[in-house]
Amino acid sequence: MADAKKEEPTKPTPEEKLAAAEAEVDALVKKGLKALDDFEKLDQKQVDRIVAKASVAALNKHLVLAKMAVEETHRGLVEDKATKNIFACEHVTNYLAGQKTVGIIREDDVMGIDEIAEPVGVVAGVTPVTNPTSTAIFKSLIALKTRCPIIFGFHPG
């Protein structure tokens, strides 16, 4: 009986890994551009409602997210992560409240200049291993307020 050798799966080459990563990023950007089209149609009241609802949703999960962050990163204390999550939800939202981010946001009649807020496009959000959840929360809220889709690159640590 002949020895049947098991074929080991081949590991992807660095070039194949890079191509796969580029394809994934391209797909995410394509989805982000679709979201951008939808975001551009929103008025200030709709944007503010979305930010408020996102903030409340994150606030409702602040402790669960804190526990997950500590479990995944093995860094920090749950209590500290929870506090940072609450800060990101409440204080960032309160700071952004009342700030105009849609349409004409300032008029200078003397110079005859109007400042108009427009989304800058799909943005990248980098998150540190030390504060993954609070960083994702506050960057998400800011991206929502400015009507910019955001793609996160989480630290692999």
Where are these regions (language model features)?
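Conserved small-residue-rich beta-alpha loop and adjacent elements
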Residues: 97-157
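N-terminal Rossmann-like NAD(P)+-binding subdomain of aldehyde/semialdehyde dehydrogenases
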Residues: 2-113
